[in-house]
Every structure is written in structure tokens, then in C-alpha cells.
């Protein structure tokens, strides 16, 4: 029996989780000398590297002095709540990584709470102690207070602390005494984290994540809870709905370094990948062929937001994407459901090309849209809608805990903005020059808030939020008050016409871009929508000498990210997403029909 430790890493965005794992793998000699280190091995998907967030959990294992350490990476964002709970079920302990300057952040709190509820033993790593003006001692106190407020047990509160800098590759018990490597941390993991309990009996394994290989098909990943699994063994799969199905294991793999390694037998407590099973979902149990006993399935957080997905039917349909038909989009959404547990997809009645997709928040859904866009899909999405529930006959809506960290001079602006959106301030803590303000705010109020908060604080604000509970409906919230500027006809936008319209509002297009009628090309300064002609060129006659006019001086266009577009559009608008561009448009493109619809 090999000695095993299963450990989950919990950290906030940018606190150095992925860098630390890179260094742990170096210590376990996982990279050949001279191998190109694409830093951030764990964030293997492009989107994750760009945004610095971990969306899907990864497994890596290293060998340290004869002990196998399985490192399980957890997503740090509560929008991926479904992912977090499954992953923590595989671990026996957790590594809480915090920045020596920022301290524990609100998102970390969400994952940590789940970990403490399951009863994992924590080790705290205070990272980035080499940064100027960091405050390791205070951060340690903050972590202790946080754990105490999350009802940690006495055993959990008696956690060891390791100080260090993952970037510079050292860990030590005292931040004033840098060492040369991270052996102190690895020794602590082996010493403090309990080995998995050996439970004898018939085999049981809960499937906690999926892998896919074009060669072998779907692969089930999970931790062996009881007994042993053998290569070629006959097993029964117990589904979440209670039905059972007999099948056979074709191959068993354990994690070794970055990849898999085939093995004959997997013992209790190790994490493995099972190949050759058919029809299984996350949350099913693989158990004994003769006496199947299912493990309790994992409860997944309910979705709180939904969005309309439809095929792209704009005049520029099919010019930029590879997959544009309803069949393509439908297949892609169904494929996503296999992996993405917190997602729901429902086809709109009487329409083959419209789906209502529900998820944990704007970020959760925008990551899906961005991934599809990069794969070559064209689609259109509507404004995010909050999912209401009726509880005891009262209409209720999701409420989130919102934390905004800003320089002190902007605090009053922030409080004003959030209270206008029906937020209630719950606490305000002074941290030197900055303040931490906490609110409870309806999810509706968060849509479109981030852009305004960053503008009002000159980009200084750090904002984080997580779902708390359902509460009675709080009343109407005022949305963006400015109207849209809408292109009158299809064609190429000219600098001459944009120049003449600049006093009417700000533009989302540059001269030379193609536009179509009904596309939202800018924001009007007044509340009503304005139809503008941006495709008009300058007429030249003999009277006008060609060079005497003033040159057009054009203000650069406002560039918006996908999330900003989703938060910006109104009920009668859509975002058109293609691999090369993102445009906003009216649902009814024709101006006369739109007027009629608005009147009725």
C-alpha cells in the first residue's frame, strides 16, 4: 500500500495558487531539465490563463519522499459552485493560500466554508511575503477570525502556518528567514494532512468529474471511497435517479504527474480515472456488481440567472463562424451539460432555435459563451434575467453578498450607487487608506454594476460577490437611462458622418466598420433611441475644393468586453457573438415595425 495524501488548494484569483503548484511539481521532479515551462500548468484552457481564474478543476500528483500527494485544484469563484463541492469531496485536507498583503478575500470564504463543513483539515500558506508593505502577521489574524466566524472546530482552528513566496520558490515557518526551496511545505503536508481512511468492503467510487479522450471516449474520475477497483472488473453503476446498470472496467488509470498512468488495481483513498464505462453522469456511484450500494450524490447549487440563447439571424449571419445552425448550437449546449453541473438548458416552446440557459451568475454564463465563440460558433444572447421563486406565496429573488474594496475618498460614491440598486450596507471596515464595504444586494442590482463601480472609482475598486439566499422581492431598480443610437441602413461607416454625429453620444464603432440596419452603434445622450445614418459619405462638387474642409476629428470608440455588453443591453436588445466580433442589436431590426411594437 502506498502512502497517499489528497489535498485541495483554495485561493483567491491572483494569490499565486497556480504558481505554487508549478513549484511543487518542480520539487517532485515532474519536469525534465530544459523542458519549456509554460507557467501556470493548471490553468490549461486559454480563457483561464487570460482571466486568471480557474474554471474547471484539475488533478496533478507528485511523489515526495515515498508519499504520493494528489493535488486537487479548486475553482475560486462562487459562480462555479457546482464544481467546488464535487472537488472537495475528493480531498482529506486543504491548503488555504492567501496573499500577505490582501488577506483572505470574499470569494475564498465561499470555498473555505464548504471545505470546513466537510471537515477538511486546513494548512494556511501566507504567500507573496517578499512584496513591499505586506503584513503577514495581520493576515494570519484575519484568517483565524475568518475560520472562527465560519464555525471551524477546535482541531481545524489549530492550523499550521507556512510563510513564503511561490514566485521565488521558497517556504518557511518564519517569514523573516527565507529558505532556498519549498520542502518545508511538502513535509508539513505529509505530517499534518491525514492519510485516507482504509475502509474494507465492496468497492465504492463516486464519480466527481469527467474527462474526455477522442481515443477512448468519456472517462470517469473520482476517489475510491471503499475497497479496491481492479482492471477488467465487473461493476454496477448506480445512477442519481436510483436506476442501476451493469458494466465492465476496460482500463484503470491513476494520476501521475500531469498525466495518467495505467495500473492493475487502485486502493481505497486514491484518485483514479476509469475508462470503458458507458452512460454515466457526475454524481453516479461505481460499485460492486453483486451488492451495489450507492453513495449519497452531491447536492449542487441551484441556478440564479437565465439567458436566452438563439441562432444568429442578423444580416451578417454566417460570415465569420463555422457553426451557425440551430443543430450545432443545440448539440454544443447538450455536450456542455455533461460537464457543467450547475447549468440548465430548456428549449423554448414552439421554437427550434431558441433556448433558455440558466447558470450561477453572469460570469458562469459568459465563460460558456466566450468558449463557444472561440470554438467557431455564432449565436445571439439576450439580457440576463434573474430567476424568481415563490416561497410561501411570496415572490422572492436571489440576494448576494457584495464586497467592494476602494480608496477612502470613493466610499460615499460606492454606497450611493449600491443603495440606489436596493442594496443594504452591512459593514464598513477601514484598512488604512482603503475601506472594505459589505452589502446585501439583489442579483438584479449587480447586473451592470461592475462597469459603473470601476468608472466611479477611476479603476481602483476591487469588487466580489456571492449568492447568499432568496429573500422577498425588493421592488423595481432603475436600469441604464440613456437610449441607443441605431444604424439606419446597412453599409460601411464613414468618418464624415460619425464626425457630424459625435455631439449626439458616444460610439461603439470606428470609421470603416461594416454595420447593418438595426445595429446599436452608440449610446445616445438622451433617454430616447435615435436612428442615425453613419453610412453617408461626403458629396464632392466643383464648388468645394477637395482640401479646404476641416479634417474629421473622431473620438475613439468605446470598447466593451462580453460581460459589459451583456450588462449593457436592454430588454429589446441582443448581443450578437461571432468568433471575430461582438455587436449589439435591436431584436426587431426594422425601424417601422419596432415603432409599432413599442406603441402596442
Predicted feature locations:
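Long insertion/accessory domains within large nucleic-acid-processing enzymes
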Residues: 255, 260-263, 441, 454-456, ...
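Conserved nucleotide-binding/hydrolysis micro-motifs of P-loop NTPases
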Residues: 15, 27, 31, 77-78, ...
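Conserved catalytic-core segments of large NTP-driven translation/proteostasis enzymes
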Residues: 148-282, 402-407, 440, 466, ...
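Conserved C-terminal guanine-recognition region of P-loop GTPase G domains, centered on the G4
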Residues: 94-156
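Catalytic P-loop NTP-binding/switch module of NTPases
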Residues: 225-351, 374, 556
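Active-site phosphate-binding and catalytic loops of NTP-dependent enzymes
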Residues: 30-57, 80, 146-159, 190-203, ...
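P-loop NTPase switch module centered on the Walker A-proximal segment
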Residues: 1-104, 142, 210-213
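Charged, conformationally dynamic linker/hinge segments
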Residues: 300-435
Amino acid at each position: 500500500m502506498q502512502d497517499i495524501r489528497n489535498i485541495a488548494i483554495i485561493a483567491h484569483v491572483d494569490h499565486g495558487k497556480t504558481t505554487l503548484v508549478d513549484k511543487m511539481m518542480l520539487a517532485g521532479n515532474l519536469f525534465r531539465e530544459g523542458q519549456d515551462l509554460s507557467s501556470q500548468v493548471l490553468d490549461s484552457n486559454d480563457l483561464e490563463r487570460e482571466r486568471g481564474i480557474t474554471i474547471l478543476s484539475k488533478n496533478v500528483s507528485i511523489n515526495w519522499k515515498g508519499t504520493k500527494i494528489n493535488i486537487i485544484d479548486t475553482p475560486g469563484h462562487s459562480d462555479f459552485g457546482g464544481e467546488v463541492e464535487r472537488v472537495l469531496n475528493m480531498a482529506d485536507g486543504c491548503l488555504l493560500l492567501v496573499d500577505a498583503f490582501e488577506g483572505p478575500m470574499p470569494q475564498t470564504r465561499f470555498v473555505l466554508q464548504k471545505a470546513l463543513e466537510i471537515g477538511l483539515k486546513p494548512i494556511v500558506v501566507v504567500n507573496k511575503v517578499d512584496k513591499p508593505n505586506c503584513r503577514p502577521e495581520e493576515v494570519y489574524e484575519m484568517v483565524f477570525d475568518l475560520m472562527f466566524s465560519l464555525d471551524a472546530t477546535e482541531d481545524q482552528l489549530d492550523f499550521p502556518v507556512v510563510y513564503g513566496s511561490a514566485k521565488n520558490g521558497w517556504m518557511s515557518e518564519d517569514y523573516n528567514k527565507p529558505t532556498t526551496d519549498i520542502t518545508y511545505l511538502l513535509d508539513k503536508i505529509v505530517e499534518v494532512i491525514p492519510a485516507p481512511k482504509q475502509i474494507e468492503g465492496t468497492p465504492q467510487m463516486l464519480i466527481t468529474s469527467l474527462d474526455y479522450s477522442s481515443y477512448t471516449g468519456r472517462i470517469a474520475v473520482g476517489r475510491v471511497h471503499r475497497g479496491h477497483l481492479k482492471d477488467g472488473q465487473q461493476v454496477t453503476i448506480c445512477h442519481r435517479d436510483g436506476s442501476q446498470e451493469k458494466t465492465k472496467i476496460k482500463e484503470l488509470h491513476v494520476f501521475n504527474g500531469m498525466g495518467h498512468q495505467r495500473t492493475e488495481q487502485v486502493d481505497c483513498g486514491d484518485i483514479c480515472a476509469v475508462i470503458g464505462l458507458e452512460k454515466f453522469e457526475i454524481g453516479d456511484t461505481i460499485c460492486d456488481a453483486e451488492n451495489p450500494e450507492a453513495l449519497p450524490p452531491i447536492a449542487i447549487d441551484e441556478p440564479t440567472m437565465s439567458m436566452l440563447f438563439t441562432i444568429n439571424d442578423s444580416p451578417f449571419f454566417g460570415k465569420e463562424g463555422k457553426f451557425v445552425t440551430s443543430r450545432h448550437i443545440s448539440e454544443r449546449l447538450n455536450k456542455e451539460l455533461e460537464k457543467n453541473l450547475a447549468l440548465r438548458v430548456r428549449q423554448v416552446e414552439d421554437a427550434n432555435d431558441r433556448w433558455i440557459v440558466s447558470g450561477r451568475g453572469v460570469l458562469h454564463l459568459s465563460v460558456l459563451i466566450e468558449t463557444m465563440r472561440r470554438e467557431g460558433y455564432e449565436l445571439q444572447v439576450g439580457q440576463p434575467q434573474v430567476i424568481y421563486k415563490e416561497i410561501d406565496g411570496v415572490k422572492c429573488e436571489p440576494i448576494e453578498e457584495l464586497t467592494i474594496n476602494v480608496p477612502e475618498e470613493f466610499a460615499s460614491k460606492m454606497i450611493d450607487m449600491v443603495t440606489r440598486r436596493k442594496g443594504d450596507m452591512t459593514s464598513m471596515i477601514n484598512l488604512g487608506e482603503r475601506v472594505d464595504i459589505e452589502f446585501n444586494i439583489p442579483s438584479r442590482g449587480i447586473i451592470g454594476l461592475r462597469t459603473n463601480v470601476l468608472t466611479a472609482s477611476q479603476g481602483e475598486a476591487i469588487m466580489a460577490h456571492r449568492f447568499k439566499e432568496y429573500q422577498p422581492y425588493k421592488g423595481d431598480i432603475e436600469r441604464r437611462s440613456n437610449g441607443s443610437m441605431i444604424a439606419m441602413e446597412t453599409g460601411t461607416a464613414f468618418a464624415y458622418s460619425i464626425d457630424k454625429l459625435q455631439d449626439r453620444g458616444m460610439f461603439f464603432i470606428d470609421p470603416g466598420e461594416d454595420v447593418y440596419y438595426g445595429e446599436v452603434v452608440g449610446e445616445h445622450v438622451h433617454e430616447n433611441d435615435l436612428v442615425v445614418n453613419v453610412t453617408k459619405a461626403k458629396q464632392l462638387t466643383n464648388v468645394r475644393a477637395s482640401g479646404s474642409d476641416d479634417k474629421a476629428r473622431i473620438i475613439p470608440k468605446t470598447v466593451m468586453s462580453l460581460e459589459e455588453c451583456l450588462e449593457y443591453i436592454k430588454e429589446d436588445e441582443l448581443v450578437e457573438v461571432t468568433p471575430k466580433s461582438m455587436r449589439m442589436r435591436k431584436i426587431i431590426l426594422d425601424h417601422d415595425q419596432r415603432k409599432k411594437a413599442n406603441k402596442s
